[in-house]
Amino acid sequence: MPTPSMEDYLERIYMLIEEKGYARVSDIAEALEVHPSSVTKMVQKLDKSDYLVYERYRGLVLTAKGNKIGKRLVYRHELLEDFMKIIGVDDTHIYKDVEGIEHHISWDAIDRIGDLVQYFQENQTRIDDLREIQKRNDFPEDE
């Protein structure tokens, strides 16, 4: 199993390849806001763990294993963002909140959150009912 740091890289590499068709060390460094030498070290580690194939100065390609995990990590991230929106988390907090929890939640919990997201998305009335409950439970800022 990849470490949380490896997951961050795999997720970003997968996204870059989906968006651009390729992922260069410089693109990964920019996206993750890290130094290119850090990316090179992690890419070598991911290569050694068979998540990707890396050739210096030529680029990298995800293996079937890396592609499968990358896709699942992106799904997890997007699902958690959807969940946060449904439960009414302010948009300015969603990304940071998802980044804070995505590595600390089991895949079983992700599957159950997926069920819950589906439940709410299938019927807008359910989301509206949740918003009404939230309005009743929210306290004014100055109390």
Swiss-Prot record:
Its main location: cytoplasm. Residues 1-63 form the HTH dtxR-type domain. Keywords: Activator, Cytoplasm, DNA-binding, Manganese, Metal-binding, Repressor, Transcription, Transcription regulation. InterPro entries: DtxR_MntR_Metal-Reg (IPR050536), Fe_dep_repressor (IPR001367), Fe_dep_repressor_sf (IPR036421), HTH_DTXR (IPR022687), HTH_tscrpt_reg_MntR (IPR022897), Iron_dep_repressor (IPR022689), WH-like_DNA-bd_sf (IPR036388), WH_DNA-bd_sf (IPR036390). GO terms for molecular function: DNA binding; DNA-binding transcription factor activity; manganese ion binding; protein dimerization activity. Gene3D superfamilies: Iron dependent repressor, metal binding and dimerisation domain, Winged helix-like DNA-binding domain superfamily/Winged helix DNA-binding domain. Mn(2+) 2 binds at E11, H77, E99, E102. It holds the Pfam family Fe_dep_repr_C. Mn(2+) 1 binds at D8, E99, E102, H103. One of its GO terms (cellular component) is cytoplasm. DNA binding is strongly activated by Mn(2+). One of its GO terms (biological process) is intracellular manganese ion homeostasis. It is found in: Cytoplasm. Homodimer. Central regulator of manganese homeostasis. Belongs to the DtxR/MntR family. NCBIfam families: PRK03902.1. HAMAP family: HTH_MntR. This is HTH-type transcriptional regulator MntR. It comes from Shouchella clausii (strain KSM-K16). The gene is mntR.
